[in-house]
Amino acid sequence: PLFNSCDFISRVLQSCINQTLKDIEILIIDDKSKDNSLNMVLEFAKKDPRIKIFQNEENLGTFASRNLGVLHSSSDFIMFLDSDDFLTPDACEIAFKEMKKGFDLLCFDAFVHRVKTKQFYRFKQDEVFNQKEFLDFLSKQRHFCWSVWAKCFRKDMILKIFEKVKIDERLSYGEDVLFCYIYFMFCEKIAVFKTCIYHYEFNPNGRYENKNQEILNQNYQDKKKSNEIIKRLSREFLFDEFHQKLFEVLEREEKSLCMRANKI
């Protein structure tokens, strides 16, 4: 998804163009950007036919934009990339090689660039799980692995998500949790790797760190909506122990967002 990212878009596109695996699609979903980022992408697209640009008729938010990107894709495997982040050069090659082994989902580690560069998840070792084992693994992690970045998904399984939730649901916060939650419920074979394939750039003006009152209020409303959808869908899946732990985390996050929105 692309929205007002002119400060970062050249770097992220260059990281895609320079992938060691050349047979890839680079899909850009412009969510009504108001800066020069779309024009910058158009210049890149003139030089690389793998770059395909789609423009939303109105601002739809991150969740809907990603979903529309999936529908426009022709690949069996999908990776998501935020416009202020970037990939390691071999990210697609590593993911493609592993997905060909029959996995439903790959989870990788990522570098986080803040004051210092650190590994985000810090997985101790490479592991393969069935669904129950993976949900147990998630429950014990410091971070629940909810981000859609640093993962590789199967397109046919993503389409199952669209049977459970509106494709154009307007969400720009809490959307990763909703997407991954539904996807995890369909997974049977999952691999976790300690290899870092993704660079997450700390952006003080980004959605998650922004202190603007209007954005904070919208973040809270989006998170609340996401949690409500997850709780409604949870009745369809029989993982009571996992859901109990999950709801504790989600409610804590929602309460924290509410406090941030009311504090400023």
Protein language model features and the residues they cover:
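Conserved short acidic donor-positioning loop in nucleotide-sugar-dependent glycosyltransferases
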Residues: 16, 31-32, 60, 83
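Short loop->beta transition adjacent to catalytic acidic/histidine clusters or analogous donor-positioning motifs
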Residues: 17-28, 36, 48-52
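Donor-binding/catalytic cores of nucleotide-activated saccharide
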Residues: 62, 83-191, 198-217
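Short aromatic/hydrophobic "clamp" motif used to bind/position activated sugar donors
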Residues: 78
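C-terminal subregions of glycosyltransferases and related glycan-biosynthesis enzymes
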Residues: 147, 171-172, 192, 196-264
